[in-house]
Each structure stands twice: as C-alpha cells, then as structure tokens.
Regions:
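Basic side chains
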Residues: 2-3, 124
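Sec-dependent N-terminal signal peptides
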Residues: 3-13
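Exposed acidic/polar residues on beta-strands and adjacent loops within beta-sheet cores, strongest
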Residues: 17-138
Length: 138
C-alpha cells in the first residue's frame, strides 16, 4: 500500500502536464528569422516554457533552463578576448513576467561571431497558453 501512495505522489504532476502543439510560421528577413507558433493546453507558464525547451528548435537551447521568479536582466562577457583587439563576446538574457504572460529573450552580441537572438513569449488565454518563439541569426 505504501508503494502505491508513493507511485501516485510521483505521478500526480504528470496528470496536470499539458499538451504542446506547434506549427512553423513564415521565415522572414531573407531566411534568417524563424517563427514558431505553439499552443500549450494548460495554465502553468513555467510548465509551458519547459515543454518548449524540450522541442528540437534551432536556438532554443540558448534560453535559460531555469527561470527567475521575478523580472531580471543578466549581462555577461566572455572571460577571454576573441581577437587581437581585445574584443569579447557579450550576452544579455532578459526575463519579464506578468500574471498572465512570460517573455524570455537571449541576445548574443558577437564581437567575433555573428549575433543571434532567441525570444519566446507565452500568453495565458483561457485554459491554454499561446506561445510565439522566434530565432534570428545574421
């Protein structure tokens, strides 16, 4: 009986896990910006975000695995210079939350590599969450 309770306790979060369905939107900016539109059946923004991170979408691995509970901006530079002039690659990750939305943007400002931008916006609407993911590279 004890094993059954443990099994039920472990499986309970899965009962509330939502279903994610995605379709690719138009590629814009001469093919360097990809758009994906997804719908997550559920109301948990963090669960929808984690479901999106599990998708095999180009650039999504750049988004942070863990989210802060509050709005935040994190900036950092690579510790070593990438050219003879001392330039360093810079990265900016921004998380913005409201009660019904979540936006995460990861901007790589390459000094020696091409800049990239990955952005995901989740909007709670009724019993589902509408998601727009965009990745740009130049």
């Amino acid at each position: 009986m004890k094993k059954l309770f443990i099994l039920l306790a472990l499986a309970a979060p899965l009962a509330y896990a939502g279903e994610l369905s995605c379709k690719q939107g138009a590629t814009t900016n001469e093919g360097i910006t990809d758009h994906w539109h997804c719908t997550y059946q559920g109301r948990d923004l963090d669960a929808a975000y984690q479901a999106m991170r599990q998708q095999d979408l180009y650039g999504i691995e750049a988004l942070p695995a863990k989210l802060t509970r509050r709005n935040s901006t994190r900036k950092w530079q690579d510790s070593s210079a990438c050219d003879d002039d001392g330039n360093r690659d810079r990265t900016v990750t921004t998380i913005r939350r409201t009660s019904n939305s979540l936006t995460v943007e990861h901007l790589f400002l390459g000094a020696c590599f091409n800049p990239t931008d990955a952005k995901i916006h989740l909007q709670r609407q009724g019993g589902k969450i509408l998601i727009h993911y965009q990745h740009s590279a130049s």
